[in-house]
């Protein structure tokens, strides 16, 4: 079983799209291994973000692991296209599809890693039937759809429950948190059992490289 590593995955939803390439290079140069790509359709969540063209444009210019978070209805319609555009991991919401196992199998068939996500109102137990089938579980710590929200503390309790499920099964599944993560609460998320940290507005502001390095140091 591989060891669990702490990983920072900055969300480009909070980047400056006028200079997206520069912002990505800033976090990459700081030693950040992953990049979180939030895709929103205006149906599953109220906001619309970006989609395959942005992912396809980014892919040739970075070796970072592209962690693609689909906040879209019926994600099984598009997972193969996102994989083809350069996603390393395709992550979808349990609440967005009636065929969770089918969606997992579609992603797995592309050779990409698979993630499943739950919203704040969804209980931790919802992921239990799928733990052996996926590479990562994402627990939303805010309502998905908008950046810059405050973390919902109760959601971290779900992280602890899911980490115990993973450990009890002898798995090495990554456990990601997304929403309202800053330097002052990232250690709390790690202590609850998360090992992949999504941070958006806390990284993509002012001195981006310095912000990223501060997170990496705090997460050691």
Where are these regions (language model features)?
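Short gly/ser/thr-rich secondary-structure transition/capping motifs
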Residues: 117-121
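Conserved N-terminal beta1-alpha1 strand-loop-helix module at the mouth
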Residues: 2-91, 96-99, 106-109, 113-114, ...
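A short, mixed-charge helix-start or loop-turn motif at secondary-structure junctions
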Residues: 6, 144-145
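Active-site/ligand-binding-proximal alpha/beta "capping" segment
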Residues: 143, 150-191, 195-196
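Short beta-strand segments at enzyme active-site cores
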Residues: 35-38, 175-177, 199
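Acidic, Mg2+-coordinating phosphoryl-transfer loop and its flanking beta/alpha structural elements
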Residues: 194-199, 205
């Amino acid at each position: 079983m591989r060891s669990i590593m702490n990983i920072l995955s900055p969300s480009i939803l909070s980047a400056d799209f006028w200079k997206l390439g520069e912002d990505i290079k800033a976090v990459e140069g700081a030693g950040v291994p992953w990049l979180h790509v939030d895709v929103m359709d205006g149906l599953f969540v109220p906001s619309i973000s970006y989609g395959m063209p942005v992912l396809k444009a980014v892919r040739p210019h970075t070796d970072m692991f592209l962690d693609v978070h689909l906040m879209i209805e019926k994600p099984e319609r598009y997972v193969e296209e996102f994989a083809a555009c350069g996603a390393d991991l395709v992550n979808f919401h349990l609440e967005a599809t009636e065929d969770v196992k089918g969606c997992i199998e579609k992603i797995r068939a592309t050779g990409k890693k698979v993630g499943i996500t739950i919203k704040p109102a969804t209980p931790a137990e919802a992921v239990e039937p799928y733990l052996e089938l996926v590479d990562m579980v994402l627990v939303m710590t805010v309502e998905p759809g908008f950046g810059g929200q405050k973390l919902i503390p109760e959601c971290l309790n779900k992280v602890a429950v899911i980490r115990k499920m993973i450990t009890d099964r002898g798995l090495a599944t990554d456990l990601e948190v997304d929403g309202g993560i800053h330097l002052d609460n990232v250690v709390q998320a790690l202590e609850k059992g998360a090992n992949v940290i999504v941070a958006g507005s806390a990284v993509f502001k002012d001195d981006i490289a310095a912000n990223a390095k501060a997170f990496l140091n705090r997460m050691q």
